[in-house]
């Protein structure tokens, strides 16, 4: 596992849900590659965030936040998740995967494998 920066904490307003891109080097056998992965960050309070993997737990399609319905939605097969990542509708077998996070000098760091 490694910790990678997801952005400055103050760029995520309290009460917001945002998609942001993280970039890191993933090692595979004898080589490594740079991977760019979108994640979802929800900011509840000044110091409280929840970071989600943005892949639907059904087949891995991208999930996005719909501010009108206030839920995460997957356009591929109609999957829907509540603000906490719990399944509301569709075929997803489990909630959205959460990413461990920490604040380090004002930067949100997320743990990736």
Q: What are these regions, as identified by a protein language model?
A:
Residues 64-67, 82-85:
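Short Cys/His-rich "knuckle" micro-motifs
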Residues 67-69, 90:
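Short linker/helix segments within small regulatory modules
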Residues 1-57, 61-66, 95-113:
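N-terminal pre-ligand scaffold of iron-sulfur
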């Amino acid at each position: 596992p490694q910790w990678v920066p997801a952005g400055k904490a103050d760029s995520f307003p309290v009460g917001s849900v945002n998609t942001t891109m993280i970039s890191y080097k993933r090692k595979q056998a004898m080589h490594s590659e740079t991977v760019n992965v979108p994640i979802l960050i929800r900011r509840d309070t000044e110091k409280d965030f929840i970071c989600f993997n943005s892949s639907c737990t059904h087949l891995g399609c991208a999930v996005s936040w719909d501010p009108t319905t206030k839920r995460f939605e997957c356009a591929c097969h109609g999957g829907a998740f509540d603000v906490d990542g719990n399944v509301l509708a569709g075929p997803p077998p489990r909630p959205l995967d959460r990413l461990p996070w920490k604040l380090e000098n004002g930067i949100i760091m997320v743990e990736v494998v």
